[in-house]
Design a protein with these regions (language model features):
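Short, conserved catalytic or interaction motifs in soluble domains
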Residues: 39, 187, 249
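N-terminal Rossmann-like NAD(P)+-binding domain of SDR-like oxidoreductases, especially those catalyzing
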Residues: 1-184
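Short, well-ordered secondary-structure micro-motifs
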Residues: 44, 135, 189, 224, ...
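C-terminal substrate-binding subdomain of Rossmann-fold SDR/epimerase-dehydratase oxidoreductases
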Residues: 62, 203-319
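A conserved pocket-lining segment of Rossmann-fold NAD(P)-dependent short-chain dehydrogenase/reductase
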Residues: 92, 145-149, 176-190, 200-224, ...
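Hydrophobic alpha-helix immediately C-terminal to the catalytic Tyr-X-X-X-Lys motif of short-chain
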Residues: 160, 164, 168, 201, ...
Length: 319
């Protein structure tokens, strides 16, 4: 990336977004953050505010607000990293209108602001775990060419947002890269929510509370560490134009395997509590990172064992 780039990060007080903001500031860029703090926290930016406050500007705003267009236009970012979203699959099922307002209308507001500002690139956080639907096991790990058949309104909004990015590129010349993220985990992930099993397990293991595994625990996910994901966002600043790019490890890890590894690392010798399978949960998921290697020069380097150990250490230090 060029020195002293002007960047804007939506959702920059959230889990992934705040880690991205830290990386951008560490590389001496000027960063605007847009976040309504509905799920993000200013605590995630405490270190950045203390060390680099002169290059960080925070705006508490909901991306559904039409004024976002003017705000983005005024800030004139060279690159927009669009991570703000309603990201809870269950909420998208129970509140589909709200989900669409945030993830579709909000995205259009951000894109309109970028158009007026003359932004050269938008890097978008898509969802590899939802846009492909229930993949054929023979197709795992999924490539970007896999048919897209979302099974939730959330997955649909991510697919629609990609089409808006494509259209804005064709009509207005705004370059984009959409990163289809696998199951991201790492420091600052919320241990109290419904999503983010690594953070949930970490919080419960360290507080000596039982961890719950739903179904038989053999459902698999592709767990990718947040620092690796941030590196993909940074690389996409100048690469991968016009593409959907998977950001995952290509490795399936079952929930049982995940729990066993984390329990060992935490020094806990007790089985997880078992609960009935949750309806609508994917049986298996993994993303092929081959396109990311070719077009972004990106590869994941953090193993699940190393990454989950770092998460446990972070939770201990944050207690």
């Amino acid at each position: 990336m060029r020195d002293q780039m002007k960047a804007l990060v939506t959702g920059g007080a959230g889990f992934i977004g705040s880690n991205l903001v830290d990386r951008l500031l560490a590389e001496d860029h000027e960063v605007d953050v847009l976040d309504d703090l509905s799920s993000g926290s200013l605590a995630n930016q405490a270190e950045a505010r203390a060390d680099r406050a002169n290059r960080l500007t925070f705006h508490q705003v909901d991306i559904r607000d039409p004024h976002v267009v003017d705000l983005v236009a005024r800030r004139q970012p060279e690159v927009v990293y669009h991570l703000a979203a309603q990201a809870d699959v269950r909420v998208s099922v129970t509140r589909p209108v709200f989900d669409a307002e945030v993830n579709v209308i909000g995205t259009v507001n951000v894109l309109e602001g970028a158009r007026v500002a003359g932004t050269r690139k938008v890097v978008f956080a898509s969802s590899g775990g939802t846009i492909y639907g229930e993949p054929d096991p023979a197709a795992l790990p999924c490539k970007e060419s896999h048919p897209q058949a979302p099974l939730s309104p959330y997955g649909v909004t991510k697919r629609v947002a990609f089409d808006y990015l494509r259209v804005y590129r064709e009509l207005h010349g705004i370059e984009f890269t959409a990163l289809a993220l696998a199951n991201v985990y790492g420091p600052r992930q919320d241990p109290h929510g419904e999503a983010g099993v690594v953070a949930i397990f970490a919080g419960r293991l360290l507080s000596v509370e039982p961890c719950t595994v739903f179904g038989d625990g053999e459902q698999t996910r592709d767990y990718v560490y947040v620092d690796d994901v941030v590196d993909a966002f940074v690389r996409a600043t100048s690469k991968g134009g016009g593409l959907l790019v998977n950001v995952g490890t290509g490795i399936e890890t079952s929930v049982n395997q995940l729990y066993s590894a984390m329990a060992r690392s935490a020094g806990v010798d007790r089985p997880a509590a078992m609960a009935p399978e949750r309806p609508g949960e994917l049986a298996r998921s993994a993303l092929d990172p081959g396109r990311a290697a070719i077009h972004l020069g990106w590869r994941p380097w953090t193993t699940v064992e190393d990454g989950t150990s770092r998460v446990l250490d972070w939770f201990k230090q944050s207690a």
